[in-house]
Amino acid sequence: MFVYARSKYCGACKQFEAETFTNSSVIDKLNKDFILISIDVDEQKTETRDFRIRVTPTEIFLDPKGTEIKRLLGYRTNQTFLDEINKIVI
């Protein structure tokens, strides 16, 4: 599972979405290996609290049982983000 937390006021979130989340390699890898969940921290207060989200963007990778594997904070370039995904998924 991949959880992406964003805020409508977050410049880094907008950059991440415009650059990284439009990259076909990133999208293909996420769609192939993860269930995708997006959290709007301005609107979804319960989920924001449950996932302990303090900054945006936050990217959280969970195993099938819901245990956190990795948490990334802030903007990542396409290649850096793919490198992080590939460390999790072989």
What spans do the regions from the language model cover?
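Typically the conserved alpha-helix immediately C-terminal to a functionally engaged Cys/Sec
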Residues: 12-29
